[in-house]
Amino acid sequence: TYIDGDKGILLYRGYPIEQLAEKGDFLESCYLLLYGELPTQQEKNDFDRRIMQHTMVHEQFSRFFQGFRRDSHPMAVMVACLGAMSAFYHDSIDITDPQQRMIASIRLISKVPTLAAMAYKYSIGQAFVYPHNSLSYAANFLRMCFAVPCEEYQVNPVLTRAMDRIFILHADHEQNASTSTVRLAGSSGANPFACIAAGVACLWGPAHGGANEACLKMLKEIGSVKKIPEFIARAKDKNDPFRLMGFGHRVYKNYDPRAKIMQKTCHEVLKELNRQDDPLLDIAIELEHIALNDEYFIEKKLYPNVDFYSGITLKALGFP
């Protein structure tokens, strides 16, 4: 990944993130990141088929989940499940073997959505939904999360595309905290599943993967558009611990290119679900307007980042 923070540019293997998010799908970006080039149509078909052949997880995982409380944080569950994968797939735990590393990569890409959906289903007391390999990667994930046995699940192309974009935008971001954690764990010779579990544990932090959750919590705390000036004043007050979440980035000193894509995606999802009047979106739009025109934010280069709209989008999709 290449980032130019001053110009607001993000490239995956030389390709602009805007191009990949608009014209491709997540598995195409996975192929690009793994192999360095975009796939031909035949290579893409073969790669998709290979991923879909590995979407099932060992049936023992169903019993593994029973050891968790229903109200466990999903990231805690994911850390445990990813670490446990090394106990189930012994033929791909040698990190020094390139072939085993690739098999582990394929398995992780394939099985993480299944495990994440299982974690969600377990938390709400619903039956697990097995993967359906005729569906796309994103559609399969949404179905595993939200399908119920008593009715047929209808794939919504707008929501599926939104989920796909969320996956693409978060696929890679240079040497960030979780990537550094994975590489550090790997430097000790730890198996790939343990390394990824360590990375997910790092991603759990509120300053990293938890930022969109914190941003959504902030919008709820503000409560209404009328109260925005009060919170803006608090954000400017050095003696007030309140911080505006979803603004600014350690790398980007310009508008986060992922935020523009996420903003468009958020509007598409809310329109599809007939929720354009969502009060959280009204607050977000007004906050963004103020931040882009207020001298304080301009001087400090506090532009909206990808977390600003992704929390609202995920909430609208049905994730708690």
Swiss-Prot record:
One of its GO terms (molecular function) is citrate (Si)-synthase activity. Pathway: Carbohydrate metabolism; tricarboxylic acid cycle; isocitrate from oxaloacetate: step 1/2. SUPFAM superfamilies: Citrate synthase (SSF48256). One of its GO terms (biological process) is tricarboxylic acid cycle. InterPro entries: Citrate_synth-like_lrg_a-sub, Citrate_synth-like_sm_a-sub, Citrate_synthase, Citrate_synthase_AS, Citrate_synthase_bac-typ, Citrate_synthase_sf, Citrate_synthase_typ-I. It catalyses: oxaloacetate + acetyl-CoA + H2O = citrate + CoA + H(+). One of its GO terms (cellular component) is cytoplasm. This is Citrate synthase. The gene is gltA.
